[in-house]
UniProtKB/Swiss-Prot annotation:
Keyword presence, Transmembrane helix: yes
Function comment: Essential for viral fusion with host endosomal membrane and core release.
Lipidation (N-myristoyl glycine): G2
The protein, known as: Inner membrane protein pE248R
Keyword Mitochondrion: no
Keyword terms, alphabetized: Capsid inner membrane protein, Host membrane, Lipoprotein, Membrane, Myristate, Signal-anchor, Transmembrane, Transmembrane helix, Virion
InterPro entries: Virion_mem_poxvirus_L1 (IPR003472)
Length: 249
């Protein structure tokens, strides 16, 4: 498999895993403090250094349940294999009987590597929606920040060792089953054509050997028959010579 293709496949596979896990996380997140809300009403208010951070709680047992569900694993495996198929990364896996085995290996890889700790390590600074409302005239709000951590979580997932182990395992699985993809597609076709010609040449050699064999057998039988005829003719010639000699006397 080419280097650029492998990197692209690795990146895409990581993104698929991160997206799938993040979707499951959203189903298992609950707010601890509710939505942060700051309201400024009236005239002439000066607000400095406003920071908003929403603390959320992640139900790890919920995540564990969703991630370990057969449907989640199967769907994630299907997304990954379909993505690889679309890239024509594993060309021959869609033409041989090993396709089922490859999908099984990918699913097992996901089961082994995607643990709850992967989620726990990436939600420590998660923030959700923050609201700052300012009404009135002459109000000044300075140095107001609203923290957004969803991108941080996504980056954490993509950079985690477990996610990397998963994508590495999947990449190795693809390499294992698609042994022809280490070559250029046209080289693969050339190899196939070469194999056909080799088979033709082998068949031609066999035919030549058979023909030579027939010729040898025919020559042997013909020579033997001729020799027998000569042996039968020799007494007749001798007898005729003797008769002619007797008459002349």
């Amino acid at each position: 498999m080419g280097g650029s293709t492998s990197k692209n496949s690795f990146k895409n596979t990581t993104n698929i895993i991160s997206h799938s896990i993040f979707n499951q996380m959203q189903n298992c997140i609950s707010m601890l403090d509710g939505t942060n809300y700051i309201g400024v009403f009236g005239d002439g208010n000066i607000i400095n250094h406003v920071f908003q951070d929403l603390n959320l709680s992640l139900d790890t047992s919920c995540v564990q349940k969703h991630v370990n569900e057969e449907n989640f694993i199967t769907n994630l495996s299907n997304q990954i294999t379909q993505n690889l198929k679309d890239q024509e990364v594993a060309l021959t896996q869609w033409m041989d009987a090993g396709h089922h085995d490859q999908k099984t290996d990918i699913e097992e890889n996901i089961k082994v590597n995607l643990k709850t700790t992967l989620i726990q390590n990436c939600v420590s600074a998660l923030s959700g929606m923050n609201v700052l409302v300012v009404k009135g005239n002459g109000n000044i709000v300075e140095n107001a920040t609203q923290k957004q951590s969803q991108q941080i979580i996504s980056n954490c997932l993509q950079g985690s060792k477990q996610a990397i182990d998963t994508t590495t395992g999947i990449t190795n699985t693809v390499n294992q089953y698609s042994h022809y993809t280490s070559k250029n597609f046209f080289e693969f076709i050339a190899d196939a054509i070469s194999a056909v010609f080799k088979n033709i040449m082998v068949a031609a050699v066999v035919i030549v050997v058979i023909i030579v064999g027939f010729i040898a057998v025919f020559y042997f039988l013909h020579s033997r028959h001729r020799h027998e005829e000569e042996e039968e003719a020799e007494p007749l010639i001798t007898s005729k010579i003797l008769k002619n000699a007797a008459v002349s006397q």
